[in-house]
Amino acid sequence: MSSALAPVGIFDSGVGGLTVARAIIDQLPDEHIIYVGDTGHGPYGPLSIPEVRAHALAIGDDLVGRGVKALVIACNTASAACLRDARERYEVPVVEVILPAVRRAVATTRNGRIGVIGTQATINSHAYQDAFAAARDTEITAVACPRFVDFVERGVTSGRQVLGLAEGYLEPLQRAQVDTLVLGCTHYPLLSGLIQLAMGDNVTLVSSAEETAKEVLRVLAERDLLHPHPDDPRAAGPSRVFEATGDPEAFTRLAARFLGPAVSGVRPVHHVRID
């Protein structure tokens, strides 16, 4: 049985999931976290579903083996590829990023026209389209924006080139007159300014990061797994461990640019391997 003192495990294909980690830190400041960025194998978007599933479950096995009390799949592509497998495989609760964003989008839309942007793998999986199927009176337009992740992973989140790319990708959503747009990749909030500029102020952006953090809070509270208040004698100050399967120095530089000094001393993970 998991302990409330155990950490929350979070993973993504790279730095995008740090938007989820940041939201969890903001909403649950007392929690210990372990974050793994799979920069050695990501981005996941161009990979096949079996490849994504294998990489994601290898990291999940590692984190669960280290005793995390909950596992957060902070990656839309991985959520689409392996959520069912992960929930069958692990005894700890598994939180993903798709359904929380879908619920918020349905609650937000005024005209029922909702857009979704994501990696090619996420859009091809129809995970969002299927998740929206239960919502009545909604019209979903899904568009793949594969190059967004490459720009974010290189630290390029502004400039004419990225704005031009955004305008091209998002034009079908403007034609569809969506009033709510789901950022269906955890990298995309780092481009939210450009995306908002391209879509216009009348479109509401829904970030899966904030909604996922709320879901983590709900799940931990339901299972009495919230970390004790700092005044509790059992409690210790929160620890935040960041690891990368690729170059830890490159990960640190990029992550610190977005999240500041909270991300430092990133540890390399050499034992996360695919058989």
UniProtKB/Swiss-Prot annotation:
InterPro entries: Asp/Glu/hydantoin_racemase, Asp/Glu_race, Asp/Glu_racemase_AS_1, Asp/Glu_racemase_AS_2, Glu_race. It comes from the Bacteria. One of its GO terms (molecular function) is glutamate racemase activity. Its EC number is 5.1.1.3. Pfam families: Asp_Glu_race. It catalyses: L-glutamate = D-glutamate. Substrate binds at residues 12-13, 44-45, 76-77, 186-187. SUPFAM superfamilies: Aspartate/glutamate racemase. The active site is at 75 (proton donor/acceptor), 185 (proton donor/acceptor). Keywords: Cell shape, Cell wall biogenesis/degradation, Isomerase, Peptidoglycan synthesis. Pathway: Cell wall biogenesis; peptidoglycan biosynthesis. GO terms for biological process: cell wall organization; peptidoglycan biosynthetic process; regulation of cell shape. The keyword Plastid does not apply. Provides the (R)-glutamate required for cell wall biosynthesis. Belongs to the aspartate/glutamate racemases family. This is Glutamate racemase. It comes from Mycolicibacterium paratuberculosis (strain ATCC BAA-968 / K-10) (Mycobacterium paratuberculosis).
